[in-house]
Amino acid sequence: MSNRSITLLQRVDNATEQLNSKFTDIVNSAKVSSKDKSALAMETYLVEESTSAMVRSLEDLLFVTRSLKEAWILGQIRPVVNKPEDGGEGQLADELLDKIEDTSDGVDKETA
């Protein structure tokens, strides 16, 4: 696997772990019990901090998907669809790429 793939997978793992732990923190702090105003204020702050961390994690996941889309569009990665070793025909990805290349060649000829 390439370094880029490993980095993207690590980012996904870190972001999902962060989302899970922060959501757990929010749920745990939402337990109903009689609390004074200072305890409620502290819990409110912790919930706001946890939601901010969740938003950052989601933005990181969006960055990963955007990077994958850009790499695919620029031809840096090939889609793996229906692998032969999995019992599939393995032709679908190649057919899709051929159609995309034919379409882009036709557009290039029309604009030239």
Curated annotation (Swiss-Prot):
Organism: Yarrowia lipolytica (strain CLIB 122 / E 150) (Yeast)
Keyword Phosphoprotein: no
Annotated spans, Disordered: 83-112
UniProt similarity note: Belongs to the Mediator complex subunit 22 family.
Pfam families on file: Med22
PANTHER family (alphabetical): MEDIATOR OF RNA POLYMERASE II TRANSCRIPTION SUBUNIT 22
One GO term of the biological process aspect: regulation of transcription by RNA polymerase II
Protein name from the UniProt record: Mediator of RNA polymerase II transcription subunit 22
GO MF term set: transcription coregulator activity
Function summary: Component of the Mediator complex, a coactivator involved in the regulated transcription of nearly all RNA polymerase II-dependent genes. Mediator functions as a bridge to convey information from gene-specific regulatory proteins to the basal RNA polymerase II transcription machinery. Mediator is recruited to promoters by direct interactions with regulatory proteins and serves as a scaffold for the assembly of a functional preinitiation complex with RNA polymerase II and the general transcription factors.
Keywords, comma-separated and alphabetical: Activator, Nucleus, Transcription, Transcription regulation
Gene Ontology cellular component list: mediator complex
Domain of life: Eukaryota
Classification of source organism: Eukaryota, Fungi, Dikarya, Ascomycota, Saccharomycotina
Subunit structure: Component of the Mediator complex.
Subcellular location(s) per record: Nucleus
InterPro entries the UniProt entry points to: Med22
Presence of the UniProt keyword Calcium in the record: no
Compositional bias per record (Basic and acidic residues), positions renumbered to this chain: 96-112
